[in-house]
From Swiss-Prot:
It comes from Chloroherpeton thalassium (strain ATCC 35110 / GB-78). GO terms for cellular component: cytoplasm. The lineage of its organism: Bacteria, Pseudomonadati, Chlorobiota, Chlorobiia, Chlorobiales. Peptide chain release factor 1 directs the termination of translation in response to the peptide chain termination codons UAG and UAA. It comes from the Bacteria. It is found in: Cytoplasm. This is Peptide chain release factor 1. SUPFAM superfamilies: Release factor. Belongs to the prokaryotic/mitochondrial release factor family. Keywords: Cytoplasm, Methylation, Protein biosynthesis. SMART domains: PCRF. One of its GO terms (molecular function) is translation release factor activity, codon specific. NCBIfam families: prfA, PRK00591.1. The modification N5-methylglutamine is found at Q234.
Length: 358
């Protein structure tokens, strides 16, 4: 492990020199690529430096315990020894986690599909709450968020299903833990007796696929057009700008109606289809390796109830790791950082256990 860490640090220093080279700076593609690699290594190098300092401090305090005759100095050395005896193993564990192989899709952009489940109008409203939550989370992360498809409910302002595209740094790696069934417990606006109702919405997070990831044959596609119910200026309900594409071999159907032209909607729909097919391919690879299937957090099993939002008690519970917070309003306002970090740490710990077990 330590040979690997030293190699990483050497590479980090090498990139640091290259990034100040005028020849590299003038080549924007190379500069961007090196800068991304540099950023990816910085956390490991920082943790490794901290580990080495702690290890040196532990050794020095140990030597002082044996050589120091002054009682006061010896007491200080003992305190340092006790502190670093705990700190060094913790930092070593952190390094092991940081050295875990990165998942192939983690650095990619993502599509998020939200569907209202059981609960009628209340489920549709909750689905809209989740959409707003993810939109605000995207804003907090500096990600770009675009609505690809939106199927309104006929009730109180919620929706049956919606699809958004998120673009930015490490989007899929951050959002993948949101896949699954989200349950809400609250008193609906239409409830006159004050009774708490339970509703649900499902979330699917898909990594965005590149053109070279998936080969799609034209003869496998069936494309239909229809009049859009979304934005589109004067074209709305007059021109068939909305597009629905069916991938015949898999039975997957995607639709897009948010753009102003049929061509734009077709391009967006193809992007959605490619991501869905890539997600299937990725899941098959993960199943073969049995890496992510070993951990319920990582699989994002869309049939599993993962989280409950209890409005009367302002409580959110993630059932996969037993995480509970009473900051429900903040969470719905896009402050998902604490809960996602807890899920990420749990996932890393489980992967490390699996690696050691193997």
């Amino acid at each position: 492990m330590f040979d690997q860490l030293q190699s990483i640090k050497d590479r980090y220093k090498e990139i640091e020199k290259q990034l100040s080279d005028p020849g590299v700076i003038s080549n924007q593609d190379k500069f961007r690529q090196l800068n991304k690699e540099y950023s990816g290594l910085s956390e490991i190098v920082k943790a490794y430096d901290e580990y080495r300092k702690a290890k040196d401090a532990l050794q020095q305090s140990k030597e002082l315990l044996y050589t120091e005759s002054d009682p006061e100095m010896k007491e200080l050395a003992q305190a340092d020894y006790d502190e670093y005896s705990e700190k060094v193993p913790e930092l070593e564990q952190q390094l092991k986690i940081l050295l875990l192989p990165k998942e192939e899709a983690d650095s990619r952009n993502a599509m998020v599909e939200i569907r209202a489940g059981a609960g009628g109008d209340e489920a549709a409203l909750f689905a809209a709450d989740l959409l707003r939550m993810y939109q605000r989370f995207a804003e907090r992360n500096g990600w770009k968020c675009e609505v690809l498809d939106y199927n309104e409910s006929s009730g109180l302002g919620g929706f049956k299903e919606a699809t958004i595209s998120l673009s930015g740094d490490d989007v899929y790696g951050t959002m993948k833990f949101e896949s699954g069934v989200h349950r809400v417990q609250r008193v609906p606006e239409t409830e006159t007796q004050g009774r708490v109702h339970t509703s649900a919405a499902s979330v699917a997070v898909l990594p965005e696929a590149e053109d070279f990831d998936i080969e799609i044959r034209k003869e496998d596609l069936q494309m239909d057009t229809y009049r859009s119910g979304g934005k589109g200026g004067q074209n709305v309900n007059k021109v068939e700008t909305a597009v629905r594409i069916t991938h015949v071999p898999s039975g997957i159907v995607v639709a897009c109606q948010e753009e102003r032209s049929q061509l734009q909607n077709r391009e967006r729909a193809m992007k959605m289809l490619r991501s869905k097919l890539y997600d299937i391919k990725l899941a098959e690879q993960q199943k073969e390796r049995a890496d992510l299937r070993r951990s319920m957090v990582s699989t994002g099993d869309r049939s599993a109830k993962i989280r409950t939002y209890n409005f009367p008690q302002s409580r959110v519970t993630d059932h996969r790791i037993g995480f509970t917070t009473h900051a429900l309003p903040q969470l719905l306002d896009g402050d998902l950082f604490e809960i996602i970090e807890a899920l990420r740490v749990h996932d890393q710990t489980e992967r490390l256990k699996a690696q050691v077990g193997a």
